[in-house]
Amino acid sequence: MKFVDTNVLVYLADRHDAGKREIAKGIIADAMRNPEEYILGAQALAEFSNVCLRKFKMDADTVRDYLGFLSGLKIAPYTLTNVERALEVKTKYQLQFFDSLLLATAEANGCDTFLSEDLNSGQVCTAA
């Protein structure tokens, strides 16, 4: 399973970086063709919505359109257990808490790949 980080979603909507936008479009297109292989975190959707509203100055209806498009994929909420695990991940890997929460949510949902530009290529993070 592949977990899609917030920045992939952001680049999908970003009109300023065509190269990263094309990569993001490819990832999301593959996710739409193979929805059983991908997971989005509810947190990532919230962060994406915030960036679209504040940074990209999109109106709420446009953001809803993006969310509707993405709603065909599995959406994973986070739990208290994920929050506790995120604290372990944050401490062990010196990551930001919300990045750690996404990683903990991915791990809890059986993901073996975390699609992001925030980690080093091939970096492996586990909370244990």
Q: For each of these PLM feature ranges, what is it?
A:
Residues 100-128:
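Acidic, metal-binding active-site segment of PIN/NYN-like and related structure-specific nucleases
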Residues 35-36, 95, 111:
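Short, high-confidence coil segments that cap the C-terminus of an alpha-helix
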Residues 5, 40-41, 95-96, 118:
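Histidine- and aromatic-rich ligand-binding microenvironments
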Residues 53-73:
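Glycine/small-residue-rich phosphate/adenosyl-binding loop
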Residues 1-40, 55-62:
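Short, well-structured N-terminal submotif of metal-dependent ribonuclease cores
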Residues 16, 39-44, 68-92:
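Acidic catalytic patch
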